[in-house]
């Protein structure tokens, strides 16, 4: 097993280039199932989740060429509609194949998903929506077995769901007639999926709002244009927190600051200043790091995927910070590891109270999920001594060239084999 060795209390400086968004690339790659032509996608991050999804598509018969952050996808050769457990178990996003496979072929079987062990993350909302569109759905031996010709309908999501919105948008693209979706997720990743489908000829209204109207093509495949994946706002936020926790000046390149409004607002409240251009953000050191109150919510609110990183940053603040996690249960699994480094954090249900300003000391810590592992790296950057972060396969699922990027900023970080 590999681990990261990190020497703390070093200043960072320089530039880091932000990769394409993993959470945008996943549904965009899946959307190639709706294409009549070969689809070229640029700025695709070379991370484990992307490779897992490509394996899944190849398993279904697609031809995929992925190199130099560009993916060339041909789904005309699809000859299989069963997404098998041994691939799906590695990653939740595999459930995204359900809507497009069903819409294109009229039947499919998709194993119930795996991925990070964060809360329940139920897929009932996906299934209820597909049933409303005329699908017959059964759960058999750990598989979602779906069949039927999809027809447009009005669908209200009881809760905002990002993957649910994406799945049903793709299903509605090939369905017969108009689908009206209410309480749709407004995340930039969902917006890009809609824009790409619109460019491919789909009639879709309300992009960027919580209400979409999609006029399905009744089974006719779409003609995709070449496009690039949007920058990863969570990766960007993580590097901003790395600059902040070491109180350093760093610049992020190839980033979209408008997608980071909530994160930047909290950094400003904590005493940091930023210089923003069309595609860069420079973080300036704070005179004093102030405590902060954060409540996670759906976009454009504060992202749950940045909660762990800000908890690490709050350990350096001069005072007591509060983090209220509203979206997922079990999303404080990093707390026990931060305590090993000398953190003062108290949990009460979904609320964490962080007393900052105490010295952090290096320790051996273990990552439990993708974003928790990045919080441990941030804490290690600020801790006195050399820390080891274990189970970093979680990091490899979502961060491209992580240690190289940190090294470019001057961090002392090494990947080693146990």
From Swiss-Prot:
EC numbers, comma separated: 2.5.1.7
Chain positions with 2-(S-cysteinyl)pyruvic acid O-phosphothioketal modification: 116
Enzyme class: transferase
Localization (cell): Cytoplasm
Record: residues binding UDP-N-acetyl-alpha-D-glucosamine: 92, 121-125, 305, 327
Family annotation (Pfam families): EPSP_synthase
CDD domains assigned to the protein according to its UniProt record, in alphabetical order: UdpNAET (cd01555)
Keywords of this entry: Cell cycle, Cell division, Cell shape, Cell wall biogenesis/degradation, Cytoplasm, Peptidoglycan synthesis, Pyruvate, Transferase
Residues annotated for phosphoenolpyruvate binding in this entry: 22-23
Principal location: cytoplasm
GO biological process, one term: regulation of cell shape
Family matches, as InterPro entries: Enolpyruvate_Tfrase_dom (IPR001986), Enolpyruvate_Tfrase_sf (IPR036968), MurA_subfamily (IPR050068), RNA3'P_cycl/enolpyr_Trfase_a/b (IPR013792), UDP_GlcNAc_COvinyl_MurA (IPR005750)
Chemical reaction(s) catalysed: phosphoenolpyruvate + UDP-N-acetyl-alpha-D-glucosamine = UDP-N-acetyl-3-O-(1-carboxyvinyl)-alpha-D-glucosamine + phosphate
GO CC terms: cytoplasm
Pathway noted in the entry: Cell wall biogenesis; peptidoglycan biosynthesis
Domain of life, source organism: Bacteria
Enzyme active site: 116 (proton donor)
GO MF annotations, alphabetized: UDP-N-acetylglucosamine 1-carboxyvinyltransferase activity
Family: Belongs to the EPSP synthase family. MurA subfamily.
Function summary: Cell wall formation. Adds enolpyruvyl to UDP-N-acetylglucosamine.
The protein's name: UDP-N-acetylglucosamine 1-carboxyvinyltransferase
Organism expressing this protein natively: Campylobacter jejuni subsp. jejuni serotype O:2 (strain ATCC 700819 / NCTC 11168)
Gene: murA
């Amino acid at each position: 097993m590999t681990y990261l060795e990190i020497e703390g209390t070093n200043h960072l400086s320089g530039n880091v280039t932000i990769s394409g968004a993993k959470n945008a690339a996943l549904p965009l790659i899946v959307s190639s199932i709706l294409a009549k032509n070969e689809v070229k996608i640029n700025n695709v991050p070379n991370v484990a989740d992307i490779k897992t999804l490509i394996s899944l598509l190849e398993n279904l018969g697609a031809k995929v060429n992925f190199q130099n952050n560009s993916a060339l996808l041909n789904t005309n050769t699809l000859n299989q509609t069963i997404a098998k457990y041994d691939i799906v178990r590695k990653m939740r996003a595999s459930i995204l194949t359900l809507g497009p496979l069903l819409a294109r072929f009229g039947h499919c079987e998709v194993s119930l998903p795996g991925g990070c062990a964060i809360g329940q993350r139920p897929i009932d909302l996906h299934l209820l929506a597909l049933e409303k569109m005329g699908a017959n759905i059964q759960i058999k031996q750990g598989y979602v077995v779906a069949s039927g010709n999809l027809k447009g309908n009005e669908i209200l999501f009881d809760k905002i769901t990002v993957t649910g919105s994406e799945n049903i948008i793709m299903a509605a693209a090939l369905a017969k007639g108009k689908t009206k979706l209410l309480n749709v997720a407004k995340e930039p990743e969902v917006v890009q999926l809609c824009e790409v489908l619109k460019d491919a000829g789909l009639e879709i209204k309300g992009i960027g709002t919580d209400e979409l109207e999609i006029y399905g093509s009744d089974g006719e495949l779409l003609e995709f244009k070449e496009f690039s994946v949007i920058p990863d706002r969570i990766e960007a936020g993580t590097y901003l927190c790395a600059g902040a926790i070491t109180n350093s000046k760093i610049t992020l390149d190839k980033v979209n600051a408008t997608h980071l409004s909530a994160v930047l607002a909290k950094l400003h409240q904590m005493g940091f200043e930023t210089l923003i251009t069309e595609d860069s953000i420079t973080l300036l050191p704070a005179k004093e790091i102030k405590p902060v109150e954060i409540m996670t919510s759906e976009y454009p609110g504060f992202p749950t995927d940045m909660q762990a990183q800000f908890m690490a940053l709050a350990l350096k603040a001069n005072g007591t910070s509060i983090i209220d996690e509203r979206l997922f249960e079990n999303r404080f699994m990093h707390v026990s590891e931060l305590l090993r480094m000398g953190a003062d954090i108290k949990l009460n249900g979904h609320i964490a109270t962080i007393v900052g300003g105490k010295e952090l000391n290096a320790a051996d810590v273990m990552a439990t999920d993708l974003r928790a592992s990045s919080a441990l790296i941030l804490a290690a950057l600020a801790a006195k001594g050399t820390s080891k972060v274990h189970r970093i396969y979680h990091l490899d699922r979502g961060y491209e060239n992580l240690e190289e990027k940190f090294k470019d900023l001057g961090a002392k970080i090494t990947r080693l084999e146990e």
